[in-house]
Amino acid sequence: MEVTKKRKIRSGEEYDHLFPKPLFLDPTIKKGATVNDTVRFIPQVVRETLSQTSKLAPLLKGSNVYETCKNIWEFVYHHIAYKKDEDGKEQIRSPARGWHDRFHGIDCDCYTVFISSILSNLKIKHKLRITKYSQDHFQHIYPIVPTTGGNYI
């Protein structure tokens, strides 16, 4: 399941001041990395770059967890384009780099870092879920927020 057409992304220039300038580094963390390596690496990136969404996070806080998650989803959907990474290349961008690259597009790993960072700044417990569709390997990752009764947002 992939995006079939580009959507119009809002400018977001009113939020630019909330993000530090990104470091334009693209280090290779591990050659031949697996999905499991990526899943383990994302929380590390979130911890190391948590300050990058600390000014944005309070602006997205709603009156409850559900409203907050909705605000985060709408912000990301309207301000950051999706674009799958090149085959064989997995980029894990910091939130500042993801914001900078928002018109070009970022993939689900980078969306996950961005959203997980906001949730972490708001002290909202969440997990990362990986899934696959019609292929034998995992293709998608996204954050989920547990709710009472065993459900997830």
Q: Language model features by range: what are they?
A:
Residues 14, 24, 105-107:
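Intrinsically disordered, low-complexity peptide-like regions
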Residues 110-153:
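Hydrophobic/aromatic-rich core segments of domains that either
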Residues 68, 72, 104-119:
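Active-site nucleophilic cysteine motif
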Residues 17, 78-79, 100, 104, ...:
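Histidine (H) residue identity feature
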